[in-house]
C-alpha cells in the first residue's frame, strides 16, 4: 500500500471516440481518484451509467439529455478552439496534481481526432504518466525508458512520430539495440516473449502499442 501523500493522484479521461466496454470503464474508474469526461465522452458514460466527476470541453458534442443526466456533476465549458477537448481535460488535471492518467475513447471515430489525440500526448509526458487504452489494447508515449507488463505472444508495435534514435528493446522477439527509426519505417507486429517488455528511446517521440487481441494482420 503506498504511503499517504506519496502516491500520485490518478484519473480516467473518457473521450468521444470508440466507446470502451462498460466492464473496462467501470473497472478503470473504480481504481481512479477522478473520472473526467472530455465533452462527448459523457454520452458514453451515460450509456454505461457510470457518473463522471467532471465534464469539460467546448460542449459541442455532449447531448442535452446527457447534460440533464449529469445534473450534480461539475460541468466546465472552455470555449477556446485552439486545443482539443482531451487537452482541456489534461490541462485541468494538471491543476489538480494528477500524475497518472488513463485515457479511454481516444481512438476510433473521426480519424483526424484520433491522430490529434495521439499527437498531443508528448506535450504532457514530462508532467504526468499517460496511457491510452481500449478493450484489449494499450498505447504508451515513450519518454526515456518504458517498462510495461505484456501478456506473452501479445503484439507490440512501435510507431515513431518523426525521427527516433537510441532505440533499445527488451523482452521482444525482434530486439533492437541503439537503433534508429523514422516515420514510415516498419516497427509493427513485434511479439512479446516475456511478461515484462522494455523500450528505450533516447531521442524522438515513439508510441508503443500493445495489442492482446488475436486478430489477423491487415497487411
Give the predicted meaning of each segment.
Residues 111-122:
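Short Gly/Thr/Asp-enriched flexible loops that form oxyanion-binding sites at enzyme active sites
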Residues 122-151, 156:
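Class I SAM-dependent methyltransferase SAM-binding "motif I" and its flanking Rossmann-like core
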Residues 14, 36-39, 57, 77, ...:
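General beta-strand structural signal in soluble alpha/beta enzymes
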Residues 142-219:
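Long, charged alpha-helical interface segments
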Residues 1-69:
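N-terminal beta-strand-loop-alpha-helix module at the start
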Amino acid at each position: 500500500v503506498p504511503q499517504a501523500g506519496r502516491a500520485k493522484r490518478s484519473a480516467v479521461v473518457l473521450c468521444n471516440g470508440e466507446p470502451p466496454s462498460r466492464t473496462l470503464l467501470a473497472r478503470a474508474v473504480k481504481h481512479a481518484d477522478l473520472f473526467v469526461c472530455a465533452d462527448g465522452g459523457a454520452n458514453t458514460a451515460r450509456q454505461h451509467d457510470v457518473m463522471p466527476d467532471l465534464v469539460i470541453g467546448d460542449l459541442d458534442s455532449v447531448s442535452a439529455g446527457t447534460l440533464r443526466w449529469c445534473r450534480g456533476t461539475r460541468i466546465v465549458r472552455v470555449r477556446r478552439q485552439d486545443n482539443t477537448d482531451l487537452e482541456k481535460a489534461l490541462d485541468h488535471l494538471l491543476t489538480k496534481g494528477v500524475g497518472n492518467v488513463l485515457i479511454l475513447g481516444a481512438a476510433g471515430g473521426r480519424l483526424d481526432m484520433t491522430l490529434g489525440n495521439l499527437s498531443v500526448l508528448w506535450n504532457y509526458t514530462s508532467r504526468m504518466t499517460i496511457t491510452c487504452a481500449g478493450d484489449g489494447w494499450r498505447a504508451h508515449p515513450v519518454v526515456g525508458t518504458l517498462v510495461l507488463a505484456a501478456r506473452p505472444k501479445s503484439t507490440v508495435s512501435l510507431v515513431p512520430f518523426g525521427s527516433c534514435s537510441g532505440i533499445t528493446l527488451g523482452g521482444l522477439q525482434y530486439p533492437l539495440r541503439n537503433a534508429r527509426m523514422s516515420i514510415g519505417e516498419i516497427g509493427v507486429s513485434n511479439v512479446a516473449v516475456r511478461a515484462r517488455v522494455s523500450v528505450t528511446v533516447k531521442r524522438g517521440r515513439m508510441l508503443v502499442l500493445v495489442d492482446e487481441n488475436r486478430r489477423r494482420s491487415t497487411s
